[in-house]
Amino acid sequence: QRQMCIRDRVLLVPFATYYQGKHTVKQNFSDIVVEASLGTHTKLNLPDGSLVWLNAGSKVTYSQGFGVDDRKLTLEGEGYFEVAHNEKVPFEVCTKEVNLRVLGTKFNFKNYSNDEEVMISLVEGKVALQNGIKAMEELYLEPNERMVLNKLTGEMVKSKANVEYANIWRDNKLFFDEELLEDIAKKLMRSYDVRIEVADSLRDRRFYGDFMINKNTIEEVLEAIASTSRMNYRYENGKYILY
């Protein structure tokens, strides 16, 4: 299934090259891709003045004509957006599961391919969400509200939320608020570019804590989780095994 804002041809532009030579990209390519590799974050300025921070293992795709006739882009992974206001040209984030439309706002959009849910947290402004899995009316979010979409059922749930932690990853922080160990492992793998395997008996175990990616090593994080969650870990065959 192709999203409505995907073009046919893609130009992969490294982050540094994008900043230094965005005006010299050949016109026979229709799309620009900016990607944050595992273990890194990326910040970019879009042509309309909007700012985007990409979390580890994420990427955005947008047209070279972004901001002229439309402001559509696609997101894979997680990004925090500060959208420049433009009443005439709405800003749209397109994914297979849900599309988001705004005029100007600040929000966090999390939708990794191996996640079971899509999560959108609104900091400022107002956003309209269109379900891409099942037909329903647009859902609107106000500040300090969060939408969670189940990728299997298409169910969208809106709730009040403390969104101040939604984008702390921009500051190299990890915050786990009673999250499932399996979900924590996914974040750690992306943040530290490592492989982690969780024993089936631990998949429903939860953990609360916070860490600094640039100060705490992966071993320190796993040691803290192990000491409070009644579990062990070992490094074997190029991966960490939690048991």
Give each language-model segment a name:
Residues 3, 7-243:
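A residue-level detector for the "anchor" residue at the start of short, highly conserved motifs
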